[in-house]
Amino acid sequence: MKMKVLVFFVATILVAWQCHAYDMFPLRMNTGYGARTPEVKCASWRLAVEAHNIFGFETIPEECVEATKEYIHGEQYRSDSKTVNQQAYFYARDLEVHPKDTFVFSIDGTVLSNIPYYKKHGYGVEKFNSTLYDEWVNKGNAPALPETLKNYNKLVSLGFKIIFLSGRTLDKQAVTEANLKKAGYHTWEKLILKDPQDPSTPNAVSYKTAAREKLIRQGYNIVGIIGDQWSDLLGGHRGESRTFKLPNPLYYIQ
C-alpha cells in the first residue's frame, strides 16, 4: 500500500512539473534570440536585453510595444539614464586628469535621442529601415538625451577630452556636427564616423575596436566609454577605461 502511494505521489509531481515547465522559463524563445516571446514578461525581457542575455534580435516582441512605450516616455527611462551617467561622473571626478585622458561617447541613443524616429516606427517592433532612418538623421533635428548632456558638460569642465565615435557614415559629418551643436554639445576633440567602403570592419564591434586602437596609437588615454549598445563597449583596445551602458530596449546593433 505504501509503495502504491509513493508511486502515485511521484507520478503526480512529474505530471505537475511537465504542465508547469514552460512557466518556469517564461523567456524561452520560439526563434532567434528574442524576436518572438509567446508569454513574455516585458520588464524581464528588457532587463535581459540590458544584461546582454538576449541579443541579436531584429525587433522587440509585439506584446511589449505598449510596455516599451510607457518605459521610454515614463520616469524610469530618464532615471535609468541618470543613474548610469551619474556613475560615470562619480568615477571621473576621482581621477587625476592628464592632457590626453578621454571619454568616448557613441552618438545615436547615447548623446542624441532617436526616440522621435522610433515613435513613428512602432517603438522597435518594425524591422529597421536604413533608408528611412538616414532620411531622419539628415534632417539634423535629433534632441539631446538630457542626462547625457549634463554628464558631458561635467566631464568637459573636469578637463577630459571628448571623442564621439559613431556608426554614422562619413557623408553625414556636416549634419552630425550641426546636430550636436544644436543639441548643446559645443566642443569635442574628434568626431569619428564610419567609412562604408572599409572592408576590414564588417560590424560595429570590429569598427569601434579598430577606431579605439587608432586613438591609443595617437596617444589618447581612454578612461571611459559610454554607449547604449553592447557593440559600443565590447571588443579590445579599451585602454584603462570603465564602460557605462545606457538603457536602450528599442533595437540591437551587432
Swiss-Prot record:
Matches recorded under InterPro entries: Acid_phosphat_B-like, APS1/VSP, HAD-like_sf, HAD_sf, Veg_Stor_Prot
Instruction: Tell me yes or no: is Signal among this UniProt entry's keywords.
Output: yes
The residue range of the signal peptide is: 1-21
Q: Which GO terms describe its molecular function?
A: nutrient reservoir activity
Q: Which cysteine pairs are covalently linked by disulfides here?
A: none
Q: Propeptide residue numbers?
A: 22-34
Q: Which residues are glycosylated?
A: N129
Q: Which CDD domains match?
A: HAD_VSP
| Tissue specificity of this protein | Accumulates in the stems of developing soybean seedlings.
Please provide the record's keywords in A-Z order.
Answer: Glycoprotein, Seed storage protein, Signal, Storage protein
By its UniProt entry, which Pfam families does this protein fall under?
A: Acid_phosphat_B
Q: Does the keyword Cytoplasm apply?
A: no
- Protein purpose: May function as somatic storage protein during early seedling development.
The family annotation for this protein states: Belongs to the APS1/VSP family.
Q: What is this protein called?
A: Stem 28 kDa glycoprotein
Q: Which organism is it from?
A: Glycine max (Soybean)
Encoding gene, per UniProt annotation: VSPA
